[in-house]
Swiss-Prot record:
BP GO annotations: 'de novo' CTP biosynthetic process; UDP biosynthetic process
Pathway where it operates: Pyrimidine metabolism; CTP biosynthesis via de novo pathway; UDP from UMP (UMPK route): step 1/1
Assigned GO CC terms: cytosol
Family label: Belongs to the UMP kinase family.
Name recorded for this polypeptide: Uridylate kinase
Keywords for this protein: Allosteric enzyme, ATP-binding, Cytoplasm, Kinase, Nucleotide-binding, Pyrimidine biosynthesis, Transferase
Lineage, opening ranks: Bacteria, Pseudomonadati, Pseudomonadota, Gammaproteobacteria, Enterobacterales
Subunit: Homohexamer.
Record organism: Salmonella typhimurium (strain LT2 / SGSC1412 / ATCC 700720)
Length: 241
């Protein structure tokens, strides 16, 4: 397939799961993975792409899990939001060490730690080629960081949400459990809903669908995959109308 000389996206929203940062450790943040991700984001900035990043917090804390053990779900979700801020701080630090200008914003005020989220300020920073890391989810309990990614993607007028996962794309079945599972190159929103494919939770997915925000699922553990996605090469699964 011919490679495009120019990126196919001008502004992206990159959704990283907290689990993606933990590497093989099973918990916490793997510094080498963090640095590799920072380098891959740096490549995009050098291509002139405006990058917004939403990070999950599952490597540090899962509110839903503790809610099952009896903790109040709202409290658990607030702790989960703080976990995403911790990941955001780590990512901002990794980007700064890679000589990339980055700003961390939080949906819940944390004065002295990071900036409060402002839609206008985020867009202004993106236009000036700053990487904007958007943490603390939506700022509300009961919403996942996938919902935050779609919400922020719509707000900052991103061309696409790039959902970085541990698998190469969206499959007919879980490839870890079913070796015969095949990957889709492209799907429509309605196909995902009809086939009940696990792309993201329903609240997040329907938000993207209603605002015609394309989603591309790809494997962040595959070196160079992010660059291939933005250059329009065959990588991952694209979900559109």
């Amino acid at each position: 397939m011919a490679t495009n000389a120019k990126p196919v996206y001008k502004r992206i929203l990159l959704k990283l799961s907290g689990e993606a940062l933990q590497g093989t450790e099973g918990f916490g943040i793997d510094a080498s993975i963090l640095d590799r991700m920072a380098q891959e984001i740096k490549e995009l900035v050098e291509l002139g792409i405006q990058v917004g990043v939403v990070i999950g917090g599952g490597n540090l804390f899962r509110g839903a899990g503790l809610a099952k053990a009896g903790m109040n779900r709202v409290v658990g979700d607030h702790m989960g939001m703080l976990a995403t801020v911790m990941n955001g701080l780590a990512m901002r630090d990794a980007l700064h060490r890679a000589y990339v200008n980055a700003r961390l914003m939080s949906a819940i005020p944390l004065n002295g730690v990071c900036d409060n989220y402002s839609w206008a300020e985020a867009i202004s920073l993106l236009r000036n080629n700053r990487v904007v890391i958007l943490s603390a989810g939506t700022g509300n309990p009961f919403f996942t960081t996938d919902s935050a990614a779609c919400l922020r993607g719509i707000e900052i007028e991103a061309d696409v949400v790039l959902k970085a996962t541990k698998v190469d794309g969206v499959f007919t079945a879980d490839p870890a459990k079913d070796p015969s599972a095949t990957m889709y190159d492209q799907l429509t929103y309605s196909e995902v809903l009809d086939k009940e494919l696990k792309v993201m939770d329903l609240a997040a997915f329907t938000l993207a669908r209603d605002h015609k925000l394309p989603i591309r699922v790809f494997n962040m553990n595959k070196p160079g995959a992010l660059r291939r996605v933005v250059m329009g090469e065959k990588e991952g699964t694209l979900i559109t109308e």
